[in-house]
Amino acid sequence: MKKQWLMTLAAISAAITLYAENPSDTFICIETEKSSMILEAREGEVIFHHYGSKIGNPAQFKGLKSYRRADYGTDPQAYPATGGRYFNEAALTIEHPGSQWNTELEYISHHSYGVSDGVTRTCVFLEDPMTAVKVCLVYDAYKNEDVIICHSEITNGGKKDIILRNFYSSSLPVKAGRYLLTHFHGSWAREMQMTSEVLTNGIKTIETRKGVRTTHTENPSFILSLDTDSWNENYGEVIAGALAWSGNYRLSFQIDETDRLNILSGINPHASAYTLGKGETFVTPEMIYTYTDEGAGQASRNLHDWARNHGCYDSSITCPTLLNSWEGAYFDFDTRTITDMIDDVKDMGLEMFVLDDGWFGTEYPRNNSRQGLGDWEP
C-alpha cells in the first residue's frame, strides 16, 4: 500500500513538472509569417519578452531572471499599471474612489482563436483583485502581412465609478543597443516632413492636442530602426507603428536606466480623464505594428499590404481619378489655363476635373489668400 502511494505521488509530481515545463502552459505566443511577439504568465504577472524575428520555441525565455534590482523596478510588463514597483510611465493609471491610485493587474487567463483566413486573435485577461478592474489585452496577428494590432479593453468591475487617467492602447518594451526614431511632422503646404534622431535616456514624446487635426503637424506613426544610427530602406531590424485614432494622441518613447526602450501609444492623457461607471467597458483605439529585418522599405510595404487587404474599405475596386487645379495653377488662372488642364484630364482618361479655390472676380480678383474669396463671376 505504501509503495503504491509513493508511486502515485511520483506520478503526480512528474505530471506537475511536465505541466510547468510545457511552454504552452505559460507562454503566450503571437505570431505572423516572419515575426513573433512573446509574453509569459509568471507569478501572477504578464511579462513581455520579445517582439521581433520569428522564434519557434519560446522555452529559451523560461526562467529568465530579471536584470533589474528589486529596489528599482520589475521585469517589462505587457500592460504596466500605476502601482506596485513599476516606476516608468504606466499604460494604465486609474483614480479609484477615495483618491486611491494603486492598480496591480494579475494574470487570469488567455486564449487564441482564428478570426478569418490568416488572422488570429489572442486575448489576455488581467484583473486587480482589490479593485475588480478588469483588462483584456487584444492582439490580432495578420500572418501574411507580418502585422500585429493591439488594443486594450478596460472594465470597471467595482461598485463605484472610477476615473481613467492613462489608458494607452499598447505598451511595447524593446531592447537594443541603439534606437533611431523616424517620424513625420509639418504644417500647411509642407506636410509629412521626415525627421530621424537617435534616442537617448529620458522621454521623447510625439503628440497632438488639437482634436481631430491630428496629422497636420504631427503624424501618429513612427519607424524605429534598431542597433543603428542611420536610415536604411533595404536592410536592418525595424519596428514600425501607426495609431488608428483621429483625436488627441501621444506616442511616448522612454529609455530607462537599463537602456530598455518603453513605447506607449494611444489617446493623449492630457485633458482626457474618463469616468467609467460600474460595469462599463472602455475600448481603446488600435495600435498597428510591423517588424522586419529587411529595412524601413519592407516595414512600409507591410503596412501598405495590410491597409489594402484589411484596412481600407473596398480596396480592390479601382477608384475614379481626378485632377485638382490648385497645385498646378494656384491663383494664376485664366480661361486658357483651365481649358488646357481639362483637355489634359480627358487625354489621360481621368474622370473629373476640380476647379479649386476658383472664385475669381474682376473687380476684386482672387490674387492671394487674403482677398477675393467667394467673389465669383461666371
Regions found by a protein language model. Give the residues of each.
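Conserved, mostly hydrophobic/aromatic
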Residues: 34, 152, 279, 323, ...
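Hydrophobic h-region of N-terminal signal peptides that target proteins for export
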Residues: 10-19
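Polysaccharide-binding surfaces and accessory modules of carbohydrate-active proteins
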Residues: 23-31, 35-38, 45-254, 270
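Terminal connector regions
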Residues: 290-320, 327
